[in-house]
A protein has these predicted regions:
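Short, solvent-exposed amphipathic alpha-helical segments in soluble enzyme
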Residues: 40-42, 90-93, 151-156, 181-184
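Short, solvent-exposed polar/charged micro-motifs at secondary-structure junctions
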Residues: 62, 148, 176-177
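A broad, structural surface signal
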Residues: 14, 18, 22, 37, ...
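Flexible, low-complexity linker and terminal segments
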Residues: 2-8, 161-253
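Conserved thiamine diphosphate
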Residues: 116-170, 194-195
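Thiamine diphosphate
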Residues: 1-127, 134, 170
């Protein structure tokens, strides 16, 4: 075990990098800004990319785009940012794009209390956008879990090919203290990486999977052609109005 004296937001950033995250896109917002700061410092050291965008919407859009290339990606925000990101979150659910969305909760609704603690975004994480789908949301209860639950969030996002919410409140995000976290060598064997289709490109259908399986989206630029859309789609990803295909898609999501 490693003994560290650090903060909750900083532990989220550390765990993200040790999970294999190599892209962060976002926009600074209290009380999550320390995550963006840490990623901006540490990612360039290991060949990763950090982009601060002009707003919350573009912040998640670039993170989704990075994930489509096969890179593990993350964005971080607070409640008002989740409200702005909701359309793109829905796109991530529909297109089955893995992404970790960190929400360091503060008082709301609206601008609320930016520097005070609240835990009012749990229902928002369960149903962040319109339509029928299942959302995965993990809640952090202490400094150690800021690290371990971040690892878990990335593993779930990659396994189930979906956006995953990581929720912590302002107190844990800004809390500094001593905590024990697993050694990286112990964490390394538990890291999950998304599946890839290895067969003939002519046979590749990213959404042509069993009802209990997620899509298999090969990284862009590797010779496999497919379509990604927020519309209801068939096995190849192209839009469809076929009743059975649409219902099977929603049931699977």
């Amino acid at each position: 075990m490693r003994e560290l004296i650090t903060g909750g937001n900083e532990l989220v950033a550390l765990a993200a990098i040790e999970s294999g995250c190599r892209f962060f896109g976002g926009y600074p917002i209290t009380p999550s800004s320390e995550i963006a700061h840490e990623m901006s410092v540490e990612l360039p050291k290991i060949g990763g990319k950090f982009i601060q965008m002009e707003d919350e919407i573009s912040g998640i859009a670039v993170a989704l785009g990075a994930s489509m290339t096969g890179v593990k990606a993350m964005t971080a925000t607070s409640g008002p940012g989740i409200s702005l990101k909701s359309e793109q979150i829905g796109y991530g659910f529909m297109a089955e794009i893995p992404l970790v969305v960190v929400d360091v909760m503060r008082g709301g609704p609206s601008t609320g209390l930016p520097t005070r603690v609240s835990q009012g975004d749990i229902n928002q994480a369960k149903s962040p956008t319109h339509g029928d789908f299942c959302s995965i949301a993990l809640c952090v209860g202490n400094l150690q879990e800021a690290y371990t639950q971040t690892i878990r969030a990335f593993n779930l996002a990659e396994k189930y090919m979906t956006p995953v919410f990581l929720l912590l409140d302002e107190t844990i995000g800004h809390m500094h203290g001593k905590t024990l976290i697993p050694d990286f060598e112990d964490i390394k064997p538990t890291i999950y990486n998304r599946e890839e289709f290895k067969g003939d490109p002519k046979d590749y259908q990213p959404y042509g999977v069993a009802q209990d399986k997620p899509a298999v989206l090969n990284p862009f630029f590797k010779g496999y052609k497919y379509h990604i859309t927020g519309l209801h789609h068939g096995p190849s990803g192209f839009p469809t109005e076929d009743e059975k295909l649409s219902q099977n898609l929603i049931d699977r999501l």
